[in-house]
Amino acid sequence: MKKPIYKVLYVQVIVAIIIGIALGHFYPALATDMKPLGDAFIKLIKMVIGPIIFCTVVTGIAGMEDMKKVGRVGGKALLYFEIVSTFALILGLAATHLLRPGVGFNVDPATLNGKEVASYAAKAHGQTTVDFLMHIIPDTLVSAFSQGEILQILLIALLFGAVLAHVGERGKPVTNFIESLSSILFGMVGIITKLAPIGAFGAMAFTIGKYGIGSLLPMLKLIGTFYLTSIVFVVVVLGFIAKMVGFNILRFVAYIKEEMLIVLGTSSSEAALPQLMLKLEKLGCSRSVVGLVVPTGYSFNLDGTNIYMTMAVLFIAQATNTDLTWGQQLTLLAVTMLTSKGASGVTGAGFITLAATLAVVPTIPLSGMVLILGIDRFMSECRALTNIVGNGVATVVVSAWEKELDRSKLRAALSRDVSVTESAEV
């Protein structure tokens, strides 16, 4: 029997977002007090992200007959990430050249107050590429889970799953236990997801209440350019990839609409990570591929962040009348390919990564970040939405490459609506 419309999750989230915007606009002081509601929802999701990734990866790998497959899946995923990320970076650069959102500002860098972005710059300087790679190795097994470090948890799960596969029947009781634990955790996700409207309301009310809709007006051209470029990337680039694999990108976006609305409300792609993994399994992707590709993608396949990075850097250059040679722009692309890998699905991570990029490209004034500081929160939503679609498509593509995509499930799932709570029950 079809649910009444008021009980449908994505409808509840849409209504909550609209109410949050209205409260933030008309009662900003009260709206900023709603922040704990959004924070609490994200914390609840983060509470189960680590264990879910661990269980999904371990059970997926433990069931593999050929351990070489782990390296093969990982290699294909990283190859896909690099190719598509490069397209995203180039598209961001090309769109900014074409639409020129920063031209006409004529800002003197000497008049900008760099103190406002000093904290972001300090965080950006704090980690080199070697530090990032070393950080993947946890201090202890417990610390990876207690600190919610996705890549560290993924490393532990890979080793744990490989050992379980190696010991064979002796490890079967442990595998069965982890599979049962996984079912319980996804059941928890189904319960937590029902609170998504409250979380989306709180986060959106705080954003509008603190920054105000009026703060968007001077920068509408940049915001519009970013949103338009992201839509073009999803529809054209990801749409072409999806067509090559055998599915429609618009149907896929409709399939994950609940997760996208949660991301829109909370401005964090991590807020929908467990639900996305569940939906991708229901779509016909194998558990082992989902477990490997999705968590890795949250650090290495942030398409929305990549578009934002090149666009923001070039916008600052245009606004401050800083001329960049083609050689410098190619250097910018190379640097951004590295710095963007340090970003995560957390709100504000893109801005810290931008600071890291500008620190390596000294021609552009770091203080220019002040120009977009006030609107970054509004651009964060688009980054997160593009990231979640990109990671979803990547998982389907790698599953297809591995011949572990159930085409009948794919067709059935994209032809009807499957909610997270339904998936959890299954």
UniProtKB/Swiss-Prot annotation:
One family name in Pfam for this protein: SDF
Location, primary (coarse class): membrane
Membrane topology reported for the UniProt record: Multi-pass membrane protein
Entry annotated with the keyword Oxidoreductase: no
Superkingdom of the source species: Bacteria
A GO cellular component entry from the record: plasma membrane
Molecular function GO terms recorded: fumarate transmembrane transporter activity; malate:proton symporter activity; succinate transmembrane transporter activity
The entry's keywords: Cell inner membrane, Cell membrane, Membrane, Symport, Transmembrane, Transmembrane helix, Transport
Compartments (UniProt record): Cell inner membrane
Entry annotated with the keyword Iron: no
GO biological process: one example: L-aspartate transmembrane transport
Membrane-crossing residue ranges in chain numbering: 8-28, 44-64, 78-98, 148-168, 184-204, 222-242, 297-317, 355-375
Family assignment from sequence similarity: Belongs to the dicarboxylate/amino acid:cation symporter (DAACS) (TC 2.A.23) family.
Entry function: Responsible for the transport of dicarboxylates such as succinate, fumarate, and malate from the periplasm across the membrane.
Protein's name according to its UniProt entry: C4-dicarboxylate transport protein
Protein source organism: Paraburkholderia phymatum (strain DSM 17167 / CIP 108236 / LMG 21445 / STM815)
